[in-house]
């Protein structure tokens, strides 16, 4: 779309420079560029205002003028008779190239005239090659008071236009009024409605035309008699030509100009070809051919919106009128129509029959429904200026325009989450009101009424974008927004820790083939998903994929596999599917010794140690960790268990069943653990990391051996002591567990080491002995019920 800068300036309370207009368009999100169709022989000549002048100290006929271009001041020596303060003139800067009366080029330089420095030259019209504008000999070219300062003179004098491209969400900018309104929102200028669009409203008469409300909820027209197809005034023709519109006749030119100015398409019919009593808008029931205004004959498919009467089709609704009933050279009575077509209806029509037109461009993006009648009234006033004797009927209207504005709630917390910056409700209200919205503060949000011309505002995120328009993109005080979710950060930190600790990270696919899934021998319901010809099942455990990868590595002469994987496993619970973020650790023994050193052996406790190291790394206390027996078919029946934290199942671990390892073609023992990272992430959210200083006083310890039944976990004794709340008991460590298989009693000896510590003083033997005896007494109560004894 093309808009002359001079025409756009009439909508602003104060002139804006071309740079300001371009910056405003960029801020709005409009692609804009300047197009100048007039060529001048000068360059580097700008507009400047004379602030003040003083007589030249060494020359009676010269004056020293101080000028401003809006940003910088310039001192120029000038001899023109009209060099006075307050004038806006043409200032040639050093480096500017001008031409003399003989056509010879010369360059303006910074120089001294009679001892006073001159930083350029104030130009007369003849010095710029604009002899027709020279009104007095040796006089300066005087520019209008509204001329913006610092602008290139060629841009100011030339036929300069703004060429813009609109995205589909900016339909409200597809007119002079709409674009000027948006520019005013992001600049300091106020919107001014030109005088030709300021008038009293005309009376309207309601009709029931039977229009399809799903296509055209509002339709209006006026009948004007006593007009002709005479040319429009020269000024209007020049305006249309600057807009790349071909002048046709007064009536058609007025409808086109109002569409470009206000954004409301109008159409003029020859009244003798329209049956007003049956005029309506509806969907075409059967395909018909129609010759359009552009002379093209098209076959209209059924379902497209049309304007018609009982006798003929009058046009393709919202797109283009038919040629036969259009305004003719012989027309003396016209029907001018203005309507509101729903954007979704016109978009559907354009898919069925894509015919580009200025009307379709605006209707598909959405026009202001409350501007339909005012645009028709503007056309009437324009016509009366050209045809004062014309007779005007009342404005007839059918349908209703929804006067209720859309309401959308905006919450400050949404802006904080998305932009990383907090706004009060009062500030949000001020910003949105400056953009033309009405606001009502609520307790925790702002209720925003959307103007009728803003079809792009439908939900909260749209208002967030509007707030972005009021903010600089270079917000230095903006709080950094975390880009990662807690579970993502946990997975990265865990992977880094395990890799640094010596494990290798494996990556296996989520989709497995049925043969690999069968390795786990689980009886869970499988989730099928066709990934390729062979991979059809989503994994319910990381074990099958890791077993297959481990076997591949061992078969390629890897001495052992010490690996981990972090991935998603899938489970089905009834009709619902659940995804769980999981960590798996897989360890295998070395196949053979490669040196004189003995082979490092692996056991169930090696695997448990890795889990405990991981928890310790994440600052989780292993005191809350309990190991319970399990009966999972994937593991060795006597070397497996379930780890629980606060009674929640957190991990399964053990030696992979030998038959399963053999089935996977692995000859050596395999140990496997699978941890629920989602549960671990929830625990970390509840964990408070506190600094614990190093002790500066020595600690003391006592060793204790207990005889307990073999089914009592040693860790139970340890936790019993730690949970008693002793103020000096620093730690309890299991030293050894011994069981004599030759004895008939099924007991075992558990040796514990109790460390006592005070961070404020050195404990005496008496303090330690008293606390030790108290803890032993507590254990005696526990062992009395289990027939255990304390040996030392």
From Swiss-Prot:
GO molecular-function terms, A-Z: ATP binding; magnesium ion binding; phenylalanine-tRNA ligase activity; tRNA binding
Family of this protein: Belongs to the phenylalanyl-tRNA synthetase beta subunit family. Type 1 subfamily.
Family annotation (SMART domains): B3_4, B5, FDX-ACB
Cellular component GO terms, alphabetical: phenylalanine-tRNA ligase complex
The keyword Metal-binding is annotated on this UniProt entry: yes
Boundaries of every B5 domain copy: 403-480
Gene3D superfamilies: 3.30.56.10, Bira Bifunctional Protein, Domain 2, Ferrodoxin-fold anticodon-binding domain, Nucleic acid-binding proteins, Phenylalanyl-trna Synthetase, Chain B, domain 3
CDD domains cross-referenced by the UniProt entry: PheRS_beta_core, tRNA_bind_bactPheRS
Domain spans labelled tRNA-binding: 39-154
Name of the protein this chain belongs to: Phenylalanine--tRNA ligase beta subunit
Principal localisation: cytoplasm
HAMAP family: Phe_tRNA_synth_beta1 (MF_00283)
Catalytic reactions on record: tRNA(Phe) + L-phenylalanine + ATP = L-phenylalanyl-tRNA(Phe) + AMP + diphosphate + H(+)
Enzyme class: ligase
Enzyme Commission number(s) of this protein: 6.1.1.20
Cofactor binding note from Swiss-Prot or TrEMBL: Binds 2 magnesium ions per tetramer.
Annotated ranges, domain FDX-ACB: 695-791
Localisation: Cytoplasm
Gene Ontology BP, a term: phenylalanyl-tRNA aminoacylation
Keywords: Aminoacyl-tRNA synthetase, ATP-binding, Cytoplasm, Ligase, Magnesium, Metal-binding, Nucleotide-binding, Protein biosynthesis, RNA-binding, tRNA-binding
């Amino acid at each position: 779309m093309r808009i002359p800068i001079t025409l756009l300036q009439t909508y602003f309370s104060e002139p804006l420079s071309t740079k300001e207009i371009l910056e405003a368009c960029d801020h709005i999100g409009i692609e804009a560029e300047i197009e100048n169709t007039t060529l001048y022989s000068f360059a580097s000549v700008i507009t400047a205002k004379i602030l003040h002048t003083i007589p030249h100290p060494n020359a009676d006929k010269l004056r020293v003028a101080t000028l401003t271009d809006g940003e910088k001041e310039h001192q120029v020596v000038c001899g023109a008779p009209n060099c006075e303060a307050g004038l806006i003139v043409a200032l040639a800067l050093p480096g500017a190239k001008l031409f003399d009366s003989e056509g010879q080029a010369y360059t303006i330089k910074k120089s001294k005239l009679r001892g006073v420095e001159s930083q350029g030259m104030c130009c007369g019209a003849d010095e710029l090659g604009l002899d027709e504008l020279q009104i007095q000999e040796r006089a300066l070219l005087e520019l209008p008071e509204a001329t913006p300062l610092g602008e290139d003179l060629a841009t100011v004098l030339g036929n300069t236009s703004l060429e813009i491209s609109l995205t589909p969400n900016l339909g409200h900018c597809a007119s002079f009024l709409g674009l000027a309104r948006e520019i005013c929102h992001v600049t300091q200028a106020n919107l001014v409605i030109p005088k030709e669009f300021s008038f009293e409203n005309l009376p309207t008469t309601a009709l029931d035309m039977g229009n399809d409300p799903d296509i055209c909820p509002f339709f209006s027209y006026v009948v004007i008699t006593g007009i002709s197809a005479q040319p429009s005034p020269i000024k209007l023709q020049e305006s249309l030509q600057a807009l790349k519109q071909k002048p046709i006749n007064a009536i058609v030119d007025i409808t086109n100009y109002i569409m470009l100015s206000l954004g409301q398409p109008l159409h003029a019919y020859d009244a003798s070809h329209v049956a007003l009593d049956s005029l309506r808008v509806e969907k075409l029931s059967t395909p018909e051919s129609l010759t359009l205004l552009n002379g093209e004959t098209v076959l209209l498919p059924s379902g497209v919106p049309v304007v018609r009467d009982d006798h003929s089709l009058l046009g393709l609704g919202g797109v283009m009128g038919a040629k036969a009933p259009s305004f003719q050279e012989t027309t003396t009575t016209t029907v001018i129509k203005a309507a509101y077509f729903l954007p979704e209806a016109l978009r559907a029509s354009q898919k069925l029959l894509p015919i580009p037109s200025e009307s379709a461009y605006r209707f598909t993006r959405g026009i202001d429904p409350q501007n339909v009648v005012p645009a028709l009234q503007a056309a009437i006033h324009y016509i009366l200026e050209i045809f004062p004797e014309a007779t005007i009927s009342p404005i007839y209207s059918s349908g209703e325009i929804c006067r209720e504005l859309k309401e959308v709630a905006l919450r400050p917390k949404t802006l904080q989450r998305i932009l990383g910056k907090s706004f009060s409700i009062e500030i949000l209200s001020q910003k949105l009101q400056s953009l033309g919205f009405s606001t009502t503060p609520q307790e925790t949000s702002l209720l925003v009424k959307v103007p009728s011309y803003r079809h792009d505002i439908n939900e909260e995120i749209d208002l967030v974008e509007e707030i972005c328009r009021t903010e600089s993109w270079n917000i230095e005080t903006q709080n950094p927004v975390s880009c990662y979710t807690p579970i993502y950060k946990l997975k990265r930190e865990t992977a880094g820790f395990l890799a640094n600790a010596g494990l290798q990270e494996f990556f296996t696919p989520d989709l497995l083939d049925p043969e690999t899934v069968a390795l786990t021998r689980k009886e869970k319901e499988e989730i099928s998903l066709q990934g390729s010809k062979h991979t059809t099942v989503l994994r319910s455990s990381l074990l099958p994929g890791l077993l297959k990868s481990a076997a591949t590595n061992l078969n390629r002469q890897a001495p052992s596999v010490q690996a981990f994987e972090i991935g998603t496993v899938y489970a089905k619970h009834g009709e619902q599917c659940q995804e769980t973020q999981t960590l798996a650790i897989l360890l295998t023994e070395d196949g053979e010794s490669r040196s004189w050193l003995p082979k490092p052996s692996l056991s169930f406790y090696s695997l448990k140690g890795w889990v405990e190291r991981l928890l310790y790394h994440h600052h989780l206390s292993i005191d809350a960790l309990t190991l319970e027996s399990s009966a999972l078919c994937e593991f060795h029946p006597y070397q497996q268990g379930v780890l629980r934290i606060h009674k929640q199942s957190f991990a399964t671990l053990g030696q992979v069943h030998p038959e399963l390892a053999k089935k996977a073609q692995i000859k050596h023992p395999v140990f496997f653990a699978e941890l629920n990272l989602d549960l671990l992430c929830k625990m970390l959210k509840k964990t408070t990391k506190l600094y614990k200083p190093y002790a500066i006083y020595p600690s003391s310890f006592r060793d204790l051996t207990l005889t307990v039944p073999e089914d009592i976990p040693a860790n139970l004794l340890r936790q019993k002591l730690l949970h008693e709340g002793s103020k000096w008991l620093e730690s309890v460590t299991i030293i050894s567990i011994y069981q004599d298989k030759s004895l008939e009693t099924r007991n075992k000896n558990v040796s514990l080491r109790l460390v006592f510590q005070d961070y404020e003083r050195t404990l005496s033997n008496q303090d330690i002995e008293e606390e030790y005896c108290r803890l032993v007494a507590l254990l005696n109560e526990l062992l009395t019920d289990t027939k255990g004894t304390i040996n030392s």
